[in-house]
Amino acid sequence: MDPCDCAKTGTCNCGATCKCTNCQCTTCKKSCCSCCPSGCSKCASGCVCKGNSCGSSCCQ
């Protein structure tokens, strides 16, 4: 069962075949999927980006 709960758009699969697309889920571990949008190169530890925006406090 997929433990992720992704918002409206995007897909998240935290199973054996981890895949994340435009994911906004909050339960997905960063080691599995980056929940930052594609425009963000790196997510800060424990950070979850919201929507399609990335704040400086979130991504580095």
From Swiss-Prot:
SUPFAM superfamilies attached here? Metallothionein
The protein's name: Metallothionein-2
Ligand binding (a divalent metal cation 7): 49, 54, 58-59
Return the domain comment text from this UniProt entry. Class I metallothioneins contain 2 metal-binding domains: four divalent ions are chelated within cluster A of the alpha domain and are coordinated via cysteinyl thiolate bridges to 11 cysteine ligands. Cluster B, the corresponding region within the beta domain, can ligate three divalent ions to 9 cysteines.
Q: Which residues bind a divalent metal cation 1?
A: 4, 6, 20, 23
Per the UniProt record, the source organism is Cyprinus carpio (Common carp)
In terms of InterPro entries, this protein maps to: Metalthion_dom_sf, Metalthion_dom_sf_vert, Metalthion_vert, Metalthion_vert_metal_BS
UniProt function note:
Metallothioneins have a high content of cysteine residues that bind various heavy metals.
Question: Which of this chain's residues are annotated to bind a divalent metal cation 5?
Answer: 33, 35-36, 49
Q: Give the matching PANTHER family.
A: METALLOTHIONEIN, METALLOTHIONEIN-1X
The Gene Ontology terms for molecular function here are: metal ion binding
